[in-house]
């Protein structure tokens, strides 16, 4: 396998690790990156790769938040942390909309909406939403300042926003759920953390489905490319998550909104020009 393919896998892992957690759409960036950095692999492998590489990103969440995610303590025998168990139930409730609809209609939605026009439009729409919501919430105190204060109703409503991201590429799963949280009165840090945790079952489920569809029939180079991408995505995700949590403790999400709008315009102009030129 050529070194250039390894370098491409590293670049794709970096893009995944950054864009999966910042609310700027990993799909939007992957579409652009794939336009210029194409791995010399089959179309079936690349479809699977762009989803399963997320396992590296999700393992970063598990590592960084293990104490909050683990419902068991072993100080004096095994005991259960009721608050953590309840949080997991809320995560499950939040996953229901995207989980059910995604399983039934995933291929249909991909066929209808997986194109640069949808990606560009959703980048811009949710970019505007971030700016509008942050301006609206300016000076207001959030109602939810701890994960335990998220109700089952709020969790389900955040799940509806995740469903929007599942249907329309370019929305950004993290962007949609954070927007949903902010609209529902959840603080920035809690909305971000809940988004991270919500990704665990979603990404594991999506990766499992893609692996089953691919059939685990890896060649040696394919397996190496996938592992390299996942490891790099894991390392970069750790850095990205720490950066985001530090940033939003002192700042709002408007900078990400402006970035999304600019990127959406770039995607729209670039692919429109390419289509016209042929």
Swiss-Prot record:
GO biological process: cell wall organization; peptidoglycan biosynthetic process; regulation of cell shape; response to antibiotic
Top EC category: hydrolase
GO cellular component annotations of the record: plasma membrane
Protein's organism: Desulfitobacterium hafniense (strain DSM 10664 / DCB-2)
Known function: Catalyzes the dephosphorylation of undecaprenyl diphosphate (UPP). Confers resistance to bacitracin.
Domain of life: Bacteria
Entry's EC annotation: 3.6.1.27
UniProt GO molecular function: undecaprenyl-diphosphatase activity
UniProt subcellular location: Cell membrane
Protein name: Undecaprenyl-diphosphatase
Reaction catalysed by this enzyme: di-trans,octa-cis-undecaprenyl diphosphate + H2O = di-trans,octa-cis-undecaprenyl phosphate + phosphate + H(+)
Gene field: uppP
Topology within the bilayer: Multi-pass membrane protein
Keywords on record: Antibiotic resistance, Cell membrane, Cell shape, Cell wall biogenesis/degradation, Hydrolase, Membrane, Peptidoglycan synthesis, Transmembrane, Transmembrane helix
Keyword Transmembrane helix appears in the UniProt entry: yes
NCBIfam families: PRK00281.1-2, PRK00281.1-4, PRK00281.1-5, undec_PP_bacA
TM spans (from-to): 2-22, 44-64, 85-105, 113-133, 150-170, 189-209, 223-243, 253-273
Hydrolase recorded as keyword: yes
Similarity section: Belongs to the UppP family.
């Amino acid at each position: 396998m050529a070194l250039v393919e390894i370098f491409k896998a590293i670049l794709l892992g970096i893009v995944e690790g950054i864009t999966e957690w910042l609310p700027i759409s990993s799909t939007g960036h992957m579409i652009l990156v794939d336009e210029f950095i194409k791995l010399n692999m089959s179309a079936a492998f690349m479809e699977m790769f762009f989803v399963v590489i997320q396992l590296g990103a999700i393992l970063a969440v598990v590592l960084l938040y293990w104490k909050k995610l683990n419902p068991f303590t072993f100080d004096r025998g095994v005991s259960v942390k009721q608050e953590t168990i309840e949080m997991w139930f809320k995560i499950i409730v939040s996953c229901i909309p995207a989980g059910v609809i995604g399983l039934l209609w995933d291929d249909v939605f991909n066929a209808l909406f997986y194109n640069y026009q949808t990606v560009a439009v959703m980048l811009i729409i949710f970019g505007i939403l971030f700016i509008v919501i942050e301006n609206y919430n300016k000076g207001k105190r959030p109602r939810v300042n701890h994960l335990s204060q998220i109700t089952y109703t709020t969790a389900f409503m955040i799940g509806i926003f995740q469903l929007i991201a599942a249907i329309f590429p370019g929305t950004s799963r993290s962007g949609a759920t954070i927007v949903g949280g902010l609209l529902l009165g959840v603080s920035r840090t809690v909305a971000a953390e809940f988004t991270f945790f919500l990704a665990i079952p979603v990404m594991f489920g999506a990766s499992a489905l893609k692996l089953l569809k691919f059939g685990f029939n890896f060649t040696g180079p394919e397996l190496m490319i996938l592992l390299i991408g996942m490891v790099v995505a894991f390392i970069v995700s750790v850095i990205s998550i720490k950066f985001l949590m530090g940033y939003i403790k002192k700042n709002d999400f408007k900078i990400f909104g402006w970035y999304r709008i600019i990127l959406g315009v770039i995607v729209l102009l670039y692919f429109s020009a390419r289509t016209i030129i042929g």
